[in-house]
């Protein structure tokens, strides 16, 4: 067994051991396991069966981790991503009125485009076409979007006709528990406790049980049926001009988030220099992009690489065996459906708020000295949550960037890819 694993994952060449890889895999899983509770709650609001999404989340994550482990041999955990699942539910289905089947079709098409870009030079062309400030802003804007949803789900922020928004009533036990959950996660994170997010969710749920807000239905059972969402995507329905900016939004956020995550985690593991020309990176991108494609078969929003994988790297993970362990743990998690079904939205609200704050950390890399690039970035960051749409926020910020460049006499600095995207975004606001 040891010799076989060494041959497959090159353990000795990467100066690691089976024990280290298993520990790293467990560490990575614990830090990202919150997604098996949060994702079904968010996606179910689009009309999908929550039990089926729970199983789909576990299966999509497991298969994605297996592909990453065996094909790329990198210690990366993958699962349906935060942010795009909210965009899927609240914007594409909730606001724009598309069915969740058509929305899954859009995710599939975005995944196909991502895969094509990963096996050609289109990825480098697209990344170079969009300034770094705007790429950073997309992540931060999505973070605020997630944060607003978390605050809303927890009752911490409520609607107000006079002031648009106002602070919720902390006399409501659900609102108080949401705030307590966030504080628990924050305290554990400050104290560097592994799995702070999932621990916070479980403690908040436990408190809710003791105060009589929820009923205990057990922890372990056979997985629910996946049939209600399995292979239900409507690709033909997504092939219309109205879905173009939605598909591009899924693509952009996934592309930039994945590239940044893979570069950051791999550099930390000494698997790559901080560039984008590594064979290992190319394989990892192919694995990630293919995961977004087959994830739709299980009813999932885009599957992506998790920055939480860095926790596993810190624990010693250096090869794909770490990813395989993460995938196996996701398979075992399918039997925890009774636990997942009783976790209330206010118990996961604190997790959403905390993840949102983490996503804002990239703003430190913004170029604050260039007004022409800073203003469009801030437009994206502000408008994504205020329009409740990742697509609209990106479009408004990008058009602001192009117009500022044109009227500042710097239109020659606008890349060809940027002109192409400008036409798409202008068409969206005029014709769609």
What do the predicted segments below correspond to?
Residues 75, 205, 209, 316:
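Conserved, well-structured core segments that form the ligand-binding/active-site neighborhood
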Residues 96-210, 214, 324-432:
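Membrane-embedded alpha-helical modules
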Residues 22, 42, 126, 195, ...:
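Residue-level signature of catalytic and energy-coupling elements of molecular machines
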Residues 47-66:
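Loop-to-helix transition at the N-terminal end of transmembrane alpha-helices
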Residues 64-77, 186-192, 250-257, 288-298, ...:
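Transmembrane alpha-helix interface/packing and boundary motifs in multi-pass membrane proteins
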Residues 2-39, 60, 80-139, 267-363:
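Helix-loop-helix junctions within the multi-pass membrane cores of secondary transporters/permeases
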Residues 41-53, 91-102, 241-244, 344, ...:
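Helix-coil boundary and interhelical linker segments in multi-pass alpha-helical membrane proteins
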Residues 1-52, 165-167, 199-282, 423-427:
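Helix-loop-helix hairpins and the membrane-proximal interhelical loops
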